[in-house]
Design a protein with these regions (language model features):
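Anion-binding (especially nucleotide phosphate/pyrophosphate-binding) glycine-rich loop
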Residues: 2-128
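Structural signature of FAD isoalloxazine-binding scaffolds in flavoprotein oxidoreductases
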Residues: 30, 37-42, 69-87, 133-164, ...
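A gly/ser-rich beta-alpha-beta helix-loop segment of oxidoreductase catalytic cores
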Residues: 110-148, 219
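Phosphate/pyrophosphate- and phosphate-bearing ligand-binding catalytic cores of soluble enzymes
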Residues: 16-17, 153-275, 279-280, 284-304
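Conserved beta-strand segments that form the floor/walls of ligand-binding pockets within enzyme
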Residues: 28, 96-98, 119, 123, ...
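Short, basic and Ser/Thr-rich N-terminal targeting/leader segments
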Residues: 55, 62-64, 146, 217-218, ...
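Short acidic (Asp/Glu) patches
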Residues: 104, 134-136, 166-171
Length: 304
């Protein structure tokens, strides 16, 4: 790990030892990582990820941490934190965006330039890289509707640009899901619109979020993927699990599709609650719920 640290410092990357991972995910749960390295450039990704592979160092990729559940036991390896923030117009309707840019910043950039198409994403608390990775969506819109291409590097440091068809996007999935390729940028194809209309739509959807979602508590957004033929929140309510708690982890009383941290929820609290909900739903309805956030843990049962 010393070699990786030295190389990171040589190319100007910030290195943090014993990084508190609570600060790097929206659930505010998790222990410490042996090392966290800020990847603020394509060069950093191209050099450090292959080196970690070569040195057989375990690592995880973090963006804004809005779709992660992190183990309190911490991580013995390295967290690569994508912090690149470049965003620019390529032409009148196409926007280039680095993977570390917050979705909210991309949405505001589109608004400032009179570009429509990303209104649905305003308020989603993730990064562009994370949004592409899982084909993030809300209120009838998805990343696949507005993305033109994405660039990623593989474990050898080779870069490839993927067309929208090559991204193989479907409900909360892309060609990158479950793999090790690291998204470094994306290009979005938007349409010209009236700024006042774009802002009105963004404000309308933000008001919906605030009225329906438990934004006052830490969470990872929707905790379960939508099962075919139904909705996770509906099944949870029908089975009487709204408000169900394990420690400070709770099925939100405001929106049953969200699990929230009421204060000092532990990783084990959260995982037990999720397992309990999945079991009750299956026993009572036959539906198998799938957890939407990714589990970040060195424990064998959670390793992917």
């Amino acid at each position: 790990m010393k070699l990786l640290e030295k190389e990171a410092e040589n190319i100007g990357c910030k290195v943090i030892h014993n990084a508190d991972l609570k600060k790097y995910n929206t659930f505010r749960i998790g222990g410490k990582a042996a090392m966290l390295i800020e990847l603020a450039s394509l060069e950093a990704c191209e050099k450090l990820i292959p080196l970690a592979e070569k040195e057989n160092i375990s690592y995880y990729i973090f963006g804004k941490g809005s779709n992660l559940i992190v183990d309190d036991n911490g991580i013995n390896g390295v967290i690569f934190h994508i912090s690149s923030d470049e965003i620019k117009l390529l032409d009148e309707t196409r926007v280039y965006c680095a993977a570390g840019v917050p979705l909210s910043k991309l949405c505001m950039f589109a608004l400032e330039n009179g570009l429509s198409g990303l209104e649905f994403a305003y308020g989603i608390p993730g990064s562009v890289g994370g949004a592409v990775y899982m084909n993030a969506g809300a209120y009838g819109g998805e990343v696949k509707d507005v993305i033109e291409s994405a660039e990623a590097i593989d474990t050898n440091g080779n870069s490839k640009r993927y067309s929208v068809d090559e991204l193989e996007m479907s409900y909360r999935k892309s060609v990158f899901s479950g793999g090790k390729n690291v998204i470094v940028s994306a290009v979005f194809k938007l349409v010209k619109g009236e700024r006042s209309e774009i802002k009105a739509k963004m404000d309308e959807l933000m008001q919906k979020r605030r009225s329906k979602q438990p934004l006052e508590y830490p969470s990872a957004g929707s905790t379960f993927k939508r099962p075919e033929g139904s909705y996770a929140s509906l099944l949870i309510e029908q089975c009487g699990l709204k408000g169900y708690s394990v420690g400070d982890a709770q099925v939100s009383e405001k929106h049953s599709g969200f699990v929230v941290n009421k204060g000092n929820a532990s990783f084990d609290d959260l995982m037990k609650l999720i397992c309990d909900v999945k079991k009750v739903i299956y026993d009572k309805t036959g539906y198998r719920l799938e957890c939407e956030p990714e589990i970040i843990s060195d424990r064998e049962e959670y390793r992917r």
